[in-house]
Amino acid sequence: VKIWSLLPSATEILFALGLEDYVTGVTHECDYPPQAAYKPRVTVAYVDSSRRSAEIDAQVTERFQRGQQLYGIDEAKLREDPPDVIITQDICPVCAVSPSDFAGHMEGCRARVVTLNPNLLEDVLDNVRQVGDVTGRAQEAETLVRSLEQRIEAVRQTLAGAPRKRVLCLEWLDPPMPGGHWVPQMVQAAGGIDGPIEPGRPSRKVPWEEMRALEPEVIVLMPCGFTPERAARESAVLWDLPGWSQLSAVRKGEVYAVDGNSHFSRPGPRLVEGLEVLARILHPDRCLPTTPTGSILKLVSPPAGGSTIGNSSPRFEPFA
């Protein structure tokens, strides 16, 4: 069986189920586990993800307004070595390749298309089972799911009765956008009070005044596609928001930059690590570190002058 994974989280699931030898195509973003980087790349992005947050947002908006796709498929590879199974997603046309990106290239291709559409943590676990069923690895999938469920329950038990803090998670910085889908649920499970998006609902542009009115005690920066270092660096733009510097979380240094790709944006097994990261941030007295040093960065000082006008950046340091 030849499998194309057009979703980084699906690639992680396939490798976790021991199916790496059957994966013959992955996306340009599939970088975990490290071995995935050696698989043939069968997609391309038409948006420059190296640009700053506002520029990326502008590119995406412009392409949508023109009816243009954000991603493309290597049609030559599809014809030369067609897969038997294609795994894709239909949850977010911005985050990853979706069926509309390759629908026009499927003529003559008899591959079975498996579309994943998770909204909550339990949906992600069901996706693991779904991939296991499709690939003949149902038993391995169930074993993986049970292991993840045990870790989720361990966090809940550890934090039972713990005081809850108001949390604002930002999955984009400019414009600021609160985390959606499974992120609010993760905040709740990690002992926090989630922000303006209901669990299971997609992220959307929320007026800054509405987010500011939540008076968050903790702010977690988790931009899609950003490392903690990049999130920390580009967070300088937030100091230009009205009232940002006066927020309790900012004044007390309770602003954290985390690895969005690894632990929050991709609906795969590592979301459970993300839950453990949130639990560590919100309740360091109860939760020990579970990820390498540098996975969480904590605000130490704001930009010079309190804004980006001086071209300085806020300073973050590893959170032990």
Question: PLM features: residue spans?
Answer:
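N-terminal ligand-binding lobe of clamshell/alpha-beta domains
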Residues: 1-320
